[in-house]
Amino acid sequence: MLEVYLGVGMFTAIVLVLVLVILFAKSKLVASGDIIIGINGDADKAITTGAGGKLLSVLADNGIFVSSACGGGGSCGQCRVNIKSGGGDILPTELDHISKGEARGGCRLSCQVNVKSDMEIELDEEIFGIKKWECDVISNDNKATFIKELKLQIPDGESVPFRAGGYIQIEAPAHHVKYADFDVPAKYRGDWEHFGFFKLESKVDEETIRAYSMANYPEEFGIIMLNVRIATPPPRNLSLPCGKMSSYIWSLKAGDKVTISGPFGEFFAKDTDAEMVFIGGGAGMAPMRSHLFDQLKRLKSKRKMSFWYGARSKREMFYVEDFDGLAAENENFQWHVALSDPQAEDEWTGYTGFIHNVLYENYLRDHDAPEDCEFYMCGPPMMNAAVISMLKDLGVEDENILLDDFGG
């Protein structure tokens, strides 16, 4: 009997020791209680929060919206903050976006920083002007086979003080979207049916945030206008996931409510007299339209400028009347379209081929000084890479190549 008692006692003692070890480790490794996040050395900006969560989310919960085009996934590298103390060691996931020198200076991706202890951070003052709005959908119309123009109404008495080339972030709740419910006009449905896209569904169990560039310019007041390309899986493997945000946006109808935050941006025009060359493709049309309308309508710029847009066929061209009007009203502006796959019904007599080749063969090859021009581009990744390679071969420096890189 004594042996039984001794055995039970030893087992109980071991369990108690293990519990004490776990509690001690937890006290050292897991933060508890209130945490203070000091911001810019300003006591009025400090945040008191509980332990846990990512710094990006904690800041957003307290009305401070740091840019994150990927919605906190660690892939865009935009949600940078400078951490003066606290925050722990930089993670391998951050090193693709932050150099060793930047890391030594305290640069971190806020979406990767766990809030576990008091910290001091520095933010750009512009961040404190970023706000959140609940907007009404005015319209959501196809402009091309796979591109919709989403037009949002800003609440009465409010404005989004953005600059041309800027962007907003849009929020999508958890959702289940059936592509069969999309409003796709008859002239675009052929490709959708051919590829089997109407069979697709998008099921998302958590909130999603993504960034989109404005297609409107600052003096188109009271609205936000976006060009959104649907992100489908490749036709040969429709079992792959659909684009979370684009599926949600394509499901929106007039009168629906949408939450956005902003404005953000870095893709701004330089204040010089240099010639401006704009190159776009697909939904990369959005910042091109914003920039050109801003330059020619608001600023009344006399700088020489041209716009080169690549599309697959005539059916994929949009805002044609807008740019024809700008060209008619401004002798310093021309625009050109190249079709990579014109159809017989297009009766197309304009440029054909890929836009980087067309731009080179028909303009830059004989240009006196292409290295003195400023090049603004936004389009599919392959287009961007081809244009940049061509410009480098012409001797254009990095400082004159400006890219809105959201993957087209």
UniProtKB/Swiss-Prot annotation:
A Pfam family assignment: FAD_binding_6
EC numbers for this chain: 7.2.1.1
A GO CC term assigned to this protein in UniProt: plasma membrane
PROSITE patterns for this protein: 2FE2S_FER_2, FAD_FR
Major location (coarse): membrane
Keywords: 2Fe-2S, Cell inner membrane, Cell membrane, FAD, Flavoprotein, Ion transport, Iron, Iron-sulfur, Membrane, Metal-binding, NAD, Sodium, Sodium transport, Translocase, Transmembrane, Transmembrane helix, Transport, Ubiquinone
GO biological process: sodium ion transport
Topology of the protein relative to the lipid bilayer: Single-pass membrane protein
Binding site for [2Fe-2S] cluster: 70, 76, 79, 111
GO molecular function terms listed in the Swiss-Prot or TrEMBL record: 2 iron, 2 sulfur cluster binding; electron transfer activity; metal ion binding; oxidoreductase activity, acting on NAD(P)H, quinone or similar compound as acceptor
Protein name: Na(+)-translocating NADH-quinone reductase subunit F
UniProt source species: Shewanella denitrificans (strain OS217 / ATCC BAA-1090 / DSM 15013)
